[in-house]
Every structure is written in C-alpha cells, then in structure tokens.
C-alpha cells in the first residue's frame, strides 16, 4: 500500500475513533491509525515529541473507546484457566490405554483432578462426585462401549458436561455405529475431533487415515470460513460446541466461532496430543459450564501455546519428540491465566465477521 493510501486509510480510522464508530479492532486497523498519527500529529513536531506521552495516550484512547463501544472484557480467556485452577474440578476420563497416563497428567497440570475409570458398575457413583465426563473412543471393546453409554446418561441426568472425542470414528463400521449410538443417547456439551473425524460424524463416511486427519481436508486460511459454517451447522444440529483441531483450531456454537492459531507441526509426532486436549477440554468445561464455547477456545489456545513452547525448547536443546511430550505437560503446569491471555492467538467470528482479533 502506498503512503498516500495508507494515510487516507489511517485518516478514516481516526475519524471512526473520534465518532466512536469502531465495532471491530484488528492489528491492521491499529497499524493504520498509528501510521496516520505519525503523519498528522508528529511529522510537524520535533523528533523528540515522537517519544513523548501523547503518542501512547492516543493509542490507549483508541483501545479504551473500542472497549467502551463493544462492551467486551479485555480478559476473555484468562478467567477460564483461573477458574480451573481455583475450582480444581474432578473429571472422569473413559479414555484409551495408549494415552491414559498423559491425559491424567495434563489434567493435573492444568489444575483439575482426573479419575480414569471405565468400570460400568461405578458409573452412577462417579457421576455424583465428578464435575464432567470425557468419552474417548481411541481403544474400544464392548465392555467399554457399554460403560460410555451408561456413564453419559448418568451425567446427563445430573446436568453435568459430557465431552465426546470420536477418535478414528471413520476407520471402522463398529466405531461409526458406536458414535451414532452415543450421539443418540447422550447430550454432549462439546464434541472434539480433527477435521476427518468431524466430517465422518456429519456424513457417516469412512476415512483412510485411521485416527489421523486427511491432509487434503486440512483447515487453511482459504477454507476457514467454510469450515466454520460447517462446524456451526453441526453445532446447531447437535446442541454441542464443536472443536475441530488442526493447524487452525475451530471452536464453534450455532452463532459464534473462534479460530485459534498456534501449536507446532511436531505435536503431530506425539501420540496422544489430541487425547490430551480432550481431557483438557473436559476440565475447562467442568469448571466453566456456563461458558462452553469460550472454554473450548481456551483449552485449544492453552494446548497450542504450551505446544509451541515445548517444541521451541526441543529445537533449542536438540532433543526429540519424547522430551517434547514431557515438556508439553510441564508448560501446561507452569501456564498462568495472564500468560494464556497474552499468548493466545485467535479471532472471534459472529455472523461471519471478525469481532475480536488477538495476535
């Protein structure tokens, strides 16, 4: 963009600021405003004035008026993690034996407490004492399937959140049939899966990659809006928040959606990363049952941020994916609500438009 065009665009941003017309704030609009202020206010002043308080005061006013206009809280995700650490919800995980230990540890790391019970005879008692249930379809057998259905009903009776992680649902007819039975008999607060798993739930089709997402279906900037629409339609159909995981995570209910960026490609080389996110999601939903969509976005953002940090350390120390797995749990243990708020990279969409952008 030429300087003249940038100046004109910034002038429009300043006019909107003065008239309090902003309903969207993005990094781009802020940069345009900064550029305009440089030309109009400071270009005619001594260079030293560029370092005075007037400049940041203008930006503080810009942000303050935006918050006043939209009425949105500055801290959206911070309080959700803080609630998990303060309330320490007890979460039952009916999960797979491949990732059970990691799921338990990351639940502890975020501040919640896990119970890894898949005993049908305990379902009623567990639903009384636990705050939420995570159902993971990773390793199945008929006994575990019966427990899933019974436990889900028990939690529904007590109005406690139930999470579905349909691992590899498109890999076999048995998995598809069980997923259909679960969705018929249980009201889920959130459903989490990669794009192939979510599409299989919607269409009833099969996938060729087992528990892994088909790379041809990956969420990208080009298809992001269409996948948001798909997630919102599925959310409307099921009444659940839909969390689609990938390079860009999508958390959606019937009217709003978060696009959460971050993470690292090495996370796909760690068995159980998706299962850990499912346990994390159950903990966030259990501690924040009235903010289901925000809880899903916060869980995804926390996992992405901790994954980035763990992978950076792996590269720095020339380590491997097993070390990265341990550091991922360590980073979750160390993560504060303030760090999550500052480090989260996301946009919030309403009616197809970005209303909050945090990068």
Name the predicted role of every residue range.
Residues 155, 159-184, 190:
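Glycine/small-residue-rich loop that forms an oxyanion/phosphate-binding "nest" at active or ligand-binding sites
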Residues 281-323:
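Conserved post-catalytic alpha-helical subdomain immediately downstream of the catalytic base
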Residues 41, 59, 70-116:
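Glycine-rich phosphate/adenosyl-contacting loop at the front of the ribokinase-like
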Residues 264-281, 292:
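Short glycine/threonine-rich catalytic loop with a Thr-x-Gly-x-Asp
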Residues 110-157:
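Active-site cofactor/substrate anionic-group-binding motifs, chiefly glycine-
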Residues 175-257:
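Conserved phosphate/ATP/ADP-binding segment of small-molecule kinases
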Residues 305-359:
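Charged C-terminal helix
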